[in-house]
Structures are given as structure tokens and as C-alpha cells.
Amino acid sequence: MVKRRRAVLVTPAVDRRKADLAMRSTADEIVLDLEDGVAPERKDEARSLARELVSEYGHSRRIAIRINGENTRWADDDMGMCASVSSALDSVVLPKVESPEVIVRVADRCGTQIQALVETARGIREINRICTAGPALISLIIGYADLGADLGRPALPHGRDWHPIQDAVLVAGRSENVEVIDGPHLTIADDAGFRKAKEWTDLLGFDGTWVIHPGQLDSAREIYTPSPDEMDGARRVIDALDLGHERGQGAISLDGKMVDEALVVAARRILDKGDE
């Protein structure tokens, strides 16, 4: 059974207290950050702590590590550390991905699968090619802060303002069976804004979201988990078409609506999202 990334909590690897709290949270996955959340002079300290945390928690908790970019001076040490704990590490988050080749290289170095942060204009332009990286790539995440800076627009996501980019990433991911995760809402004390942004990407079809504070976890899990009524409706659609097939029909009426294979595909996706 696949465990969904509905609510992914990102925490700086340099702060042991926050990391321990994250490990005990309700997040579906913890991302230990070695990149933007860590000052240059503390990269070695963060890398050492990340190794400890993965060794301690990784066999019972799904953990990913966001490393520094392949062309930075910290990348070799980051990748070496990830390789040393790869048996307990779920995946590596790679920033500013702009090609499938970098995904394959880093996956080989780290001995793990890769989650790709798409956060540059070139990354968006190359998104379809990025998704041809094969089994090394398991998810895409939109990084609004860096992408906004690269595009010259505000970093805060405002629903439809990002719609073309969100759809481009979603279509590319779906075409290669890659999870698509929304980037974090950057204002912490703003549950209404958080919910508005995340309900929008849930409506678009995203699988989940990054969060930057434990207080956002419950809302994220609720938004990206189908309700009991939605789950029941999906089961009824599947059962109705199964009955139609038994009768030799390609489509059947349910509650005054025609049910065919297209609706069953959507129903199965709802059941998959709600299946823990």
C-alpha cells in the first residue's frame, strides 16, 4: 500500500529540538533541510545531525533530506552522507532541478530516489523532459519562493495567479505517474490563507503539500484526504459500472448521471488518495 504525501513537514536539520518534534508529529513525511534553512557556516553541523536523525528515526519514520544543489560546494558531502544512511532514508529532495540527467546522477550518488524541486523558469520550461528521468524520480514540488524570484513576481501563492504553472507541473507529473506536491504557504499564522491556497491545488489534483509549521499539518491532511462522503460516492460509482459490465453495458445510470470508464478512473483516484 502506498503511503501518500499529503502533509510533508520541512524542518531545518540544524535544530535538534525542532527535528525531534517533527519526528513525533502527524506528518506523512519529514524533510530535513540542509539547503535554504541552514546558514553556510552551519552546513557541516546540519549534515552531521541529519545523519544522526535518519539513523535514529529512519527505520520507523519516512524521512527525506533536502540537499544543497549539485553545483554547490556542499553537494559532495551532502550526497556522501545520504549514501551512508540510504538504507534508512526514503528519498533525497534535489533543489532547482532543470534536467532529468541531474536527477539520475544524484540518485546514483545517494542510492535513493529523488524528489525534484521545480523552482526556476528553466525548470518549468523543461518540466516535461524532467519527468522522463524514470524510476529515480518519485515526486515534483513547486518551490514558490525561488520561482517567484526568478520570474519577478511575489513569492506568496495566490491560487489562480499560479494556475498555468501549477497545471504544467501537474500534467507533466501525471503523464509519468509522478506525485505532484504543492510548495509551502509562506505565512505561518494564516490558516485561512493556507486553506484557500491548498483547497485550490487539491481541486486541481495535487497529491499534497509541504508545510513549514506543525500547526498547518491538520489542515493539510484534511484538505488532501477525501471525505467519507467522497469515498462512499467513489465506491458507488465503481460498483455501479461493475454491475453494468455484468449486464453487458459499457455505461450505466447512477443518481440520474451516466457512469462510464472515465468516471471510474476518477473514482479510483479518490479511493487511492483516501487509502492509508
For each predicted feature, which ranges?
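Expand to "…catalyze enediolate/carbanion chemistry for C-C bond making/breaking, isomerization
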Residues: 1-276
